[in-house]
From Swiss-Prot:
Gene3D superfamilies: Calcium-transporting ATPase, cytoplasmic domain N, Calcium-transporting ATPase, cytoplasmic transduction domain A, Calcium-transporting ATPase, transmembrane domain, HAD superfamily/HAD-like. NCBIfam families: ATPase_P-type. SMART domains: Cation_ATPase_N. SUPFAM superfamilies: Calcium ATPase, transduction domain A, Calcium ATPase, transmembrane domain M, HAD-like, Metal cation-transporting ATPase, ATP-binding domain N. Changing residue 691 to E: Displays optimal activity near pH 8.0. The active site is at residue 334. The lineage of its organism: Bacteria, Bacillati, Bacillota, Bacilli, Bacillales. Changing residue 295 to P: Strongly increases sensitivity to CPA. CPA-sensitive. This is Calcium-transporting ATPase lmo0841. Pfam families: Cation_ATPase (PF13246), Cation_ATPase_C (PF00689), Cation_ATPase_N (PF00690), E1-E2_ATPase (PF00122), Hydrolase (PF00702). Its EC number is 7.2.2.10. InterPro entries: ATPase_P-typ_cation-transptr_C (IPR006068), ATPase_P-typ_cation-transptr_N (IPR004014), ATPase_P-typ_cyto_dom_N (IPR023299), ATPase_P-typ_P_site (IPR018303), ATPase_P-typ_TM_dom_sf (IPR023298), ATPase_P-typ_transduc_dom_A_sf (IPR008250), HAD-like_sf (IPR036412), HAD_sf (IPR023214). Belongs to the cation transport ATPase (P-type) (TC 3.A.3) family. Type IIA subfamily.
Amino acid sequence: MEIYRKSAAETFTQLEATEKGLTTSEVTKRQEKYGFNELKNKKKDPLWKLFLETFKDPMVIVLVIAALVQLVLGEVVESLIIFLVLIVNSIISVVQTRKAESSLDALREMSAPVAKVIRDGSKQSIHARELVPGDVVILDAGDFVPADGRLFESGSLKIDEGMLTGESEAVEKYIDTIPDEVGLGDRVNMVFSGSLVVYGRGMFVVTGTASETEIGKIAGLLETAEAKQTPLQRKLESFSKKLGLGILALCVLIFAVEAGRVLLGDNSADMATAILNAFMFAVAVAVAAIPEALSSIVTIVLAVGTNKMAKQHAIIRKLPAVETLGSTSVICTDKTGTLTQNKMTVVDYYLPDGTKENFPESPENWSEGERRLIHIAVLCNDSNINSEGKELGDPTEVALIAFSNKNNQDYNEIREKFIREGEIPFDSDRKLMSTLHTFNENKAMLTKGGPDVMFARCSYVFLDGEEKPMTEEILAKLKETNEEFSNQALRVLAYGYKRMPADTTELKLEDEQDIVLVGLTAMIDPPREAVYASIEESKKAGIRTVMITGDHKTTAQAIGRDIGLMDADDIALTGQELDAMPEEELDKKLEHIAVYARVSPENKIRIVKAWQKKGKITAMTGDGVNDAPALKQADIGVAMGSGTDVAKDSAAMILTDDNFVSIVDAVGVGRTVFDNIKKSIAYLFAGNLGAIIAILFALVLDWINPFTALQLLFINLVNDSLPAIALGMEKAEPDVMKRKPRDINEGIFAGGTMRAVISRGVLIGIAVIISQYIGMQISPEMSVAMAFTTLILARTLQTFAARSNVQTAFGAGFFSNKYVIGAVLLCFVLYGITVLPGAREIFSIPASFGLHEWSIAAGLALAAVVMMEIIKVVQNKFFK
């Protein structure tokens, strides 16, 4: 049986402890048994292991093999270039992994550093890490709870448990036994490590420390929550495997054909040299086919996306998250602080004369009823706003003094004018608070509390400027108004006063009778203003928004309906209802559950997994410790900037303005980034395909290999990188936020990308073949030089065609992407370097290669690109 279902006495018996605390010797024994009250460090992998892990990627393995082959053949420069690219990518990956491991460190820092305990029969202050089960701990306002425990004393104790439960209001604590099984947020006789005491005092016996606390359990969930691959990572990994196998098979075939020619041909030739040439042909195909710079370019394009998102108030911690967010189909969002402002606010009020809603902004225009309502709300109140603007006290009471300030009445002026002379503190049993003040030499008790309790104690009502007897009609109207407010999920408080004898110096419980009712206030943690539009925008983008909160079901439903998150056929579930629901039933109802209330961290992970099981890319937003495991489990975790360090460190993205709108904006950027990555990939593979076609054509016709390995590496690693990165800077397509989310099984060459790769690759290949043929009429060396020049120019000019699969270069705005213009010009400069004296020999360009040959190569390259644009126009007009 759970501790909260046992009495305090039973708990002490189970723990073999008493209210007088443990003895020093008993503490020593228990520390040996339970250890210290701190979260254990999970052993981190050494840097060398993380570094080697990055070389498991199939594309990386293929590149390593290619580099080793180059090294064996004595091509040291080519080999070193490939290895350098791989090492840089690995270092970036290791740095990102190390940053992601900081979640548990933040959790450890949340533990209270000092605890007030009773040991050996006396009060002591100790380090919180020294606590053991059975210790008796004293709590006062402002204290962090140092361990989990069962309360046995409570004096108006209120604790903010929002970091664990997501609850927006402080929880009133009791010591009574709870007979039924309830969720974490309803265990009001328990306290939890890391939560904050905002009001009152109490004493509890420690029932759990370290990993046995609720925070400790969350730490365990963080360790077991799976880190998901992004859709792009999954697609590139799958494609890399297929590409590697395909290239291997092609290379073996090429080598077999060439070797067969040698063995079946003229044996008088130098067989060893011929076999080596055959092997070099195969290596050239491997180098031409593998886009060596692909990994680096994808990383850079994603980084460009992070900069764009930063301007939209979204900071990316993990680069692949940019692309993942763009493919998101479900956003599981916390309510408090995400959809709402995380600040209780008075939104309505009611006076017995019927006045409500619009409170006069100037105190001079207040009615006497409004003036008295404000005075009671401010004076019968223990909260404050300090000189730094920090709000201190219960959020509900802070809302009341903020209400006064909002209506141009400084609450401090009221308190300075009417000093508190006595009080009866708030008590969770009677649900009232009363204070004593003097008004114009007349003593009065001011009282605020729950409406039902106040109605029962009010014999009079302040109406039309006079104190009148409470009638059944007036009481019925008050109850009706209270019900209206409650149905809107508003928190209602009632206010009243009672005239006291002039010699009154202190208040007694029996004084809280025959009160004069003044009015009601209604408050709520209101939705963020921009949330309404962002929810609608997400619907247009085909994204399902689901609210997951620790708050009450009624409140969550009201907010959900208000902001348009819940449709007519949608339902809400509590954490307990979810726990009782079998997987099959959840699977059937999942798409109609818009709100989950009173949920636990385990519930959140289950919800995320349920959506992922349906193949949906799922984002999870949150700001509390309770959100951290689900943030890690989700395909992309989105933490609020004002949230806990634990949430931020578990997330892939952080919103600096805590604005839900920023998520929708970031989705648009993410979709654009993925579009641009596909453009870059198509650009790279079209160029590579053109090179392979030329090589295979030369092989079939027994021509000389049109390229050297160094030429291909120069194009793949240096020349192609600049335009590919520039394509990552393209602006969003007009329909980017009107499309449905991408199918996660959709390949990276879907949506016309493969068609573009093939058509552009074939045109580049044809241009190179023609150029090589023309060069062969002069010399074998000239054929290589012309093939290389045509390939590099065609691939460079292809950048303009690659900007869009729909629009031509002029349709998209020829100069609208200045990075493309700059990249193309720089590529021409880089090519110019290869024909300079000294460099010609390195790149196998003969001295006789001049302007005439260059003009032929350039003309063929330009013709290929013009044909690409013509094909694009024809396809879009007749085959759309």
